[in-house]
Amino acid sequence: MRLERTSFARRLEGYTEAVSLPAQPVVEGRLLRMVGLTLEAEGLQAAVGSRCNVINESGYHPVQVEAEVMGFSGSKVYLMPVGSLAGIAPGARVVPLPDTGRLPMGMSMLGRVLDGAGRALDGKGGMRAEDWVPMDGPTINPLKRHPISEPLDVGIRSINGLLTVGRGQRLGLFAGTGVGKSVLLGMMTRFTRADIIVVGLIGERGREVKEFIDEILGEEGLKRSVVVASPADDAPLMRLRAAQYCTRIAEYFRDKGKNVLLLMDSLTRYAQAQREIALAIGEPPATKGYPPSVFAKLPKLVERAGNAEAGGGSITAFYTVLSEGDDQQDPIADAARGVLDGHFVLSRRLAEEGHYPAIDIEASISRVMPQVVEAEHLRDAQRFKQLWSRYQQSRDLISVGAYVAGGDPETDLAIARFPVMRQFLRQGLDESESLAESRARLASLLAGGQA
C-alpha cells in the first residue's frame, strides 16, 4: 500500500507542474494538406517537439491521430504522425496537447514488452509505474563521468579473451544480413553479468520481434529484461521514439545505481527513420541520401550511454549496424565507428563456414581493453591475433598445398595452432564461459603453441 501511495504521489508531481503553469487559451489550427508522411497545418501555435492531436469529425466515425511538430515555415507548421492517417481529411482540427509527455518507469517493467510510447505489447495489462519521467534525460558532464576501468563478463569466449569489454563501454556490431547478429545479442542477454538488460528492437520485421523474445531471449532472459519493440511497419516517428525510450529506460536504472546492458537492434534503422522524417519535411539529402540531421542525432543518442558519476551505475551498450552489401564504408557505419568505443565485425565468410559467433577478430577492436585487463592478458590477446592473422595471410597457399613447411617459423606455428585457435573462437548457442575461464584457456592455448 505504501508503494502505491508513493507511486501515486510521484505521478501527481508531473501533473502539478502542468497545472501550475499560467492558464492560456488553446489555439487550434487546421490541416491544410498532407504530402507523403508530412502534415501541413496553419493557425497553430506550437513549438518544435510538442505534441498535437489531429481530429477529423466530419465523417461517420471521428478519427484522432497524435502527431509531433517537426518544423515550421512562416505561419505553416509541419507535423509527423505517430500512427495511421486513415480517415484524416483537409480542414481537420489540429489541437496542441499539454506538455505531459512523461513515460512510466519502475521495476515492474522487468519482463515486459512495450512500444515506443510505453504501451504494453505483451497483453499483460498496464504497468504499476513508480516514476514518470520525461523522454530526454539529464546530460552528464563528461568530466564527471566515472572512467571505464572494470571488465564486463559477457559469457562469450572470443570477446572475453580477445576483445574484452569494459563496464560502461559503447560498442557496435557491424554486419550484413543473415550472419548471426540477433543470435549474438541473445547470447549476450543470457550470459552477461548485468543487473538489468534493456533491449530495443527498432525497425525489425514483426516476425523477428516475436522470435527474438520467444526463442533467442527466452523466458529466463526476459525475467531481467525490458524489451521495447517498434516493428518496420510502425511510423518513422514511433521507431525514433522507441530508440529514445529504451535509452531513457537504461538511464533511469543507471541513475538508480544499477549496471545496465543496453542492446539496440539496430542503430541503422534508427538513422533510416530519421532520414524518412527529414526528407519528408524538406531537408536536403547529403551523403548517400542521408540528411545532415541524421549524423547529428547519432552521437546524441549514443552519448547518453556510458558510466554515471563516481559511485553511480553504468550503461554498457551494444548497437547493431547494418552494412549494406557488407560494405564497411557505409555512411552510417562510418559515422557510428567515430562515436563508439569499439566495434565487432561479423564476417559473412565465417558464417558461411559454420563458424559461430562469426566475429572477425582481425577487423574488430575494443578500444578500452588496455584499461580493463592485465598486461599479461593483453599480450596474450595480441599474440593470438598475430598467429591468426599470419595463418589467414597464407591461407590460399596452404589450401592449394603450395606452402612448404620450414619456410617461416611464425607461419609454421600458426598452422600448428590453427585448429585450437579456431576451436577457441567457436562457441555453442547455449554455452557460456566466464571471463576468468576465457583468460585461462587463452593462456593455456598459447603456452602449448610456444616451444
Swiss-Prot record:
S-S bonds: none
**Catalytic activity entry:** ATP + H2O + 4 H(+)(in) = ADP + phosphate + 5 H(+)(out)
Q: Which SUPFAM superfamilies match?
A: P-loop containing nucleoside triphosphate hydrolases
Q: Which CDD domains match?
A: ATP-synt_flagellum-secretory_path_III_C, ATP-synt_flagellum-secretory_path_III_N, ATPase_flagellum-secretory_path_III
Question: Superkingdom, according to UniProt?
Answer: Bacteria
The protein's matches in Gene3D superfamilies, at most eight in alphabetical order, are given as: 3.40.50.12240
Chief place of localization:
cytoplasm
For whether the record's keyword set contains Flavoprotein, the answer is no
Biological process according to GO: bacterial-type flagellum assembly; bacterial-type flagellum-dependent cell motility; protein secretion by the type III secretion system; proton motive force-driven ATP synthesis; proton transmembrane transport
Q: Where in the cell is it found?
A: Cytoplasm
The similarity annotation says: Belongs to the ATPase alpha/beta chains family.
What is the official name of this protein in its record? Answer: Flagellum-specific ATP synthase
Name its species: Pseudomonas aeruginosa (strain ATCC 15692 / DSM 22644 / CIP 104116 / JCM 14847 / LMG 12228 / 1C / PRS 101 / PAO1)
Gene that this polypeptide is encoded by: fliI
